Amino acid sequence: MKPQMIPGIITGITAYVASTLIASGVIPMKSFLVLIPVMSITMIVELYRKQEKPFDSLAHTFFSVLYTALPFSMFPFSAFSRTGLNSLLPHPDITFSPGIIIGFFLLIWANDTGAYLTGVSFGRHRLMERISPKKSWEGFFGGVLLAIIVAWFLSGWLGVVDKTHWIIIAVIVSLAGTYGDLIESMLKRSTGVKDSGTIMPGHGGLLDRFDSAIISFPLVYLFLSLFG
């Protein structure tokens, strides 16, 4: 079984580029419809590939797009307005304001750093040993604590949203980011690979640098869209 790598990459790039152009007001929201023929062509191509399990091939191809491209396609909507929600509406004065994205990644790094340092120093109780033997509950709570501290500083430095919102975002990032790590580890184990790619071998692959963001940013975006 071999997924369609090139069509998958094209679909993912198309989704991200369309999101950026829509969020910045260059093209209308209906431009997302361009994904329909792209996905249809992918399914048609599968007819001619003569794979033993075409369903598995298509499932892997489209899941890869859903897992990676969809979350990152939400970043432009957050960067071109205060929370991203306004970019979905007619907005004559759309501005580029990446504060949420900058703060988001700082919180991810704070959570990872806090979890690592606390886990190495005090980790005794395994979080989910069958998936990730090194993760501990002590590390998890250490990551949450450091992320909340950083969120407190971000509220004064970046602003964008108030202190309470930043702290809630920190908790979302810590919880969902941890699940993101575990899900990516689960997927790698299920396919029998150590690294998610040839880039950055020995460190889990390039995807390991973003697995926390894949799960947590859509939830942060949802929170800000509803309550920001």
Describe the residue ranges of each PLM region.
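Membrane-embedded alpha-helical bundles of polytopic integral membrane proteins
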Residues: 1-171
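A general structural signal for short secondary-structure boundary/capping elements
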Residues: 150-151, 219-221
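Juxtamembrane boundary at the C-terminal end of a transmembrane helix
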Residues: 221-228
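Acidic (Asp/Glu-rich) catalytic motifs at the cytosolic membrane interface
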Residues: 106-124, 128, 137-141, 175-217
